[in-house]
């Protein structure tokens, strides 16, 4: 993520294995190009945080091979659901892990969000569990709600043995809800 305190020094690492060099840009301004030393698979910049867009451009033989960017998130606006699979077996045991993210109006992850998220699952499946990755959370695994941790949570959906659609819905007060459909076949 690219959300820190203004002026705070941040170490930015770029990992690569199919490039000769990486150039880093902050809000369109080049912060320089780095070439790996020896067998290193990363290069690093230490820069003061400035809100905006951080972009890394990898090149091999002078040609661009990859461009990756992240932007500073604004206030939490919506929930985003992303299943690891959109189709599971209708065998009563297959699972889909649905990642939940708190995002701003531009779709950027809000890394400091701690919103309480409520889940409902309808159709040919059920909520097999929830998680958020927090090592100190005392919330039960089998629950229809979970507080986001660094803007993220997880709901695990299990097929109930019948073929058909599984509709997973996530809501949180003040945020735009999200629904995703997983097919059981």
Per-segment meaning from a language model:
Residues 43-49, 140-161:
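Short, hydrophobic beta-strand segments
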Residues 12-16, 57, 82, 93-111, ...:
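Beta-strand-rich structural segments
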Residues 73-91:
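Low-complexity, acidic Ser/Thr/Pro/Gly-rich terminal tails and inter-domain linkers that flank the onset
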Residues 1-66, 83, 103-106:
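Long hydrophobic segments that form regular secondary structure
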Residues 34-35, 77-81, 118-137:
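Short aromatic-acidic-glycine turn motif
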Residues 2-8, 87-96:
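Short, solvent-exposed loop/linker segments at the N-terminal edge
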Residues 49-53, 93-95, 163-165:
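Extracellular Ig-like/FN3 beta-sandwich strand-entry sites
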Residues 62-75, 176-185:
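Edge beta-strands of extracellular beta-sandwich domains
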């Amino acid at each position: 993520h690219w959300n820190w305190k203004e002026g705070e020094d941040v170490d930015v690492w770029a990992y690569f294995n199919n490039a000769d060099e990486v150039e880093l840009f902050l809000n369109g301004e080049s912060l320089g190009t780095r070439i790996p030393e020896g067998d290193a698979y990363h290069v690093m910049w230490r820069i003061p945080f400035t809100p905006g867009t951080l972009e890394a451009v990898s090149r091999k033989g002078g040609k661009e091979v990859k461009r990756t960017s992240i932007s500073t998130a604004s206030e939490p606006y919506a929930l985003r659901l992303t299943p690891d699979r959109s189709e599971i077996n209708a065998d009563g045991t297959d699972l889909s892990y649905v990642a939940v993210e708190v995002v701003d109006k531009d779709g950027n992850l809000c890394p400091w969000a701690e919103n309480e998220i409520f889940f409902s699952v309808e159709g040919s499946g059920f909520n097999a569990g929830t998680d958020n990755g927090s090592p100190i959370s005392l919330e039960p695994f089998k629950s229809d709600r979970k507080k986001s941790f660094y803007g993220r949570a997880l709901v695990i959906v299990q097929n109930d043995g019948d073929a058909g659609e599984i509709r997973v819905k996530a809501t949180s007060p003040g945020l735009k809800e999200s629904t995703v459909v997983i097919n059981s076949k």
